Design a protein with these regions (language model features):
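ANL superfamily adenylate-forming
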Residues: 29-75, 90, 99-102
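Active-site loop-to-helix junction immediately N-terminal to the catalytic Tyr of the SDR YXXXK motif
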Residues: 96-97, 156
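Conserved S/T- and glycine-rich ATP-binding loop of Class I adenylate-forming
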Residues: 24, 78, 84-87, 101, ...
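Conserved AMP-binding/adenylation subdomain of ANL enzymes
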Residues: 102-143, 148-170
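Conserved helix-loop-beta element of the AMP-binding
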Residues: 20-23, 38-51, 135, 139-142, ...
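Conserved pre-ATP/AMP-binding loop-to-beta segment of ANL
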Residues: 65-83, 90, 116-120, 131-140
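Short beta-strand->loop structural element characteristic of the AMP-binding/adenylate-forming
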Residues: 1-23, 92-95, 166-170
């Protein structure tokens, strides 16, 4: 569950309760005001002074096993919850299954591949290609959309992983 980092504490509290989150990873500013969540494991990234003595992300990562245990997942199992803007009250949690996400990514990959093939065929019509060993341009993306939105998560972040393109995160 990716929560909007611009939310005020009441909205964050709502998202945590609604999603039944067990762990919260955030910076000190985002973790302030959430003391009432005593059952929630809070992990701080980029600690400035960590006056609350929270577990740091580095410690959290170092304490984990070298390998993951196998989990039984079905393609129709829920994978993510993204929250709407909440224009008519509190934000609504929108579920996506593993199948939803993979179908979206594969359809984008297919469209992108087909588009490149068509463009290459059109631009190379009647031309002879000779390789001179010149470096090939690397595909890259300047990622400026928040990861808590499906556009940033899926079309920016996940598609970049599938496409093998360089990501520059803002």
């Amino acid at each position: 569950v990716l929560l909007n980092s611009w939310w005020v504490p009441d909205e964050v509290s709502y998202g945590l309760e609604n999603s039944e989150a067990k762990i919260l990873i955030g910076d000190e500013k985002r973790l302030r005001g959430l003391e009432k969540f005593t059952e929630l494991r809070k992990i701080v990234v980029r600690p400035m002074n960590n006056s609350a003595g929270l577990e740091t992300f580095d410690t959290f990562i170092e304490s984990k096993a070298e390998s993951f245990s196998e989990s039984s997942l079905d393609t129709n199992d829920n994978a993510t919850i993204f929250y709407t803007s909440g224009s008519t009250g509190f934000p609504k949690g929108v579920l996506s299954t593993h199948r939803n996400i993979l179908a979206t990514l594969f359809s984008w990959a297919l469209v992108t591949t087909l588009k490149k093939e068509v463009e290459a065929a059109e631009s190379n019509a009647g031309q002879v290609s000779i390789s001179d060993g010149a470096p090939v341009n690397q595909s890259a993306i300047l990622h400026c959309v928040p990861l808590f939105h499906v556009t940033g998560s899926h079309s920016g972040f996940l598609m970049s992983i599938i496409a093998g393109r360089k990501m520059v995160m803002m």
